[in-house]
């Protein structure tokens, strides 16, 4: 399976609008939680078979690669910012085209952040077309973003699923919807993005979205986030599609970076194997 050769590469250095400063008032009302629902147990063995990072395994090469990524994201995620800017702890993971490793990256990055002592992480499946993250974790059939945006459930807490990995919660995509693109473009999506990002002072929100060139959902969602990671598959992603995808993003509202996927895996693995 895929691995990461290096961490974030700055795509542009245009100033971003920044994050919303989280105040005590914003944190005074805890996010409603489904207290009666037990934490969902993730099938760690199956995830490892798919090449995913898990907290119970010795995966030193993969762990170190994601440490490089998360350090750069965390360094910006909780900085003070002017009022009205997008929350910088709200991070969108996308790509130019399908099958370049965005869901792999989103999940592994969330696991890496969950290993931190000082932060929690909310992993959100906002790819309402493929819902790959929802299937990966085994949350099919649970209400998710679709049901909340369509008004079928009443609050964010009813779609947040706790997992048995400490500090990791998930919002699934929900069921398929014929107007999923319009749901992502709705004001309800803007409110949802702001709420999950500003509710807790120590939370990183990682959002797996559709590829930028496959439909308009990803570019629409990008208007709400503070950081965007564009996953690029080594030796596969062509320059022109990547340029076209980047052109859909506004660096004035979000920090944009590239992450090179599926490259130099053997060299990094060999380094850690030799140290065993």
Stretch-by-stretch model annotation:
Residues 47-85, 146-148, 153-162:
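Extended, non-globular alpha-helical segments
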Residues 2-66, 183, 243-276:
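C-terminal lobe/tail of nucleotide-utilizing enzymes
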Residues 142-150, 175-185, 236:
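Flexible beta-alpha connector loops of hexameric P-loop NTPases
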């Amino acid at each position: 399976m895929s691995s990461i050769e290096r961490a974030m590469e700055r795509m542009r250095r245009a100033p971003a609008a920044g994050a919303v400063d989280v105040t005590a008032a914003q944190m005074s009302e805890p996010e409603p939680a489904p207290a009666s629902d037990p934490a969902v147990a993730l099938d760690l063995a199956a995830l490892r078979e798919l090449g995913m990072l898990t907290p119970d395994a010795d995966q030193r090469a993969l762990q170190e690669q994601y440490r490089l990524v998360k350090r750069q994201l965390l360094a910006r995620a909780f900085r003070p910012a002017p009022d009205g800017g997008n929350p910088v702890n709200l991070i969108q993971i996308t790509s130019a085209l399908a099958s370049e490793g965005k869901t792999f990256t989103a999940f592994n990055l969330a696991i890496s952040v969950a290993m931190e002592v000082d932060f929690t992480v909310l992993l959100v499946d906002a790819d309402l077309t493929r819902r790959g993250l929802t299937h990966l974790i085994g949350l099919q059939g649970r209400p998710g973003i679709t049901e909340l945006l369509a008004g079928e459930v009443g609050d964010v807490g009813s779609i947040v699923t706790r997992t048995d990995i400490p500090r990791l919660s998930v919002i699934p995509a929900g069921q398929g919807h014929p107007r999923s693109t319009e749901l992502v473009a709705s004001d309800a999506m803007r409110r949802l993005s702001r709420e999950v990002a500003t509710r807790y002072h120590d939370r990183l929100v990682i959002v797996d979205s559709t590829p930028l060139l496959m439909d308009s959902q990803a570019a629409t969602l990008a208007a709400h986030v503070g950081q965007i990671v564009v996953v690029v598959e080594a030796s596969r992603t062509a320059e022109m599609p990547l340029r076209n995808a980047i052109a859909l993003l506004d660096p004035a509202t979000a920090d944009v970076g590239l992450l090179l996927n599926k490259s130099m895996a053997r060299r990094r693995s060999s380094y850690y194997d030799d140290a065993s």
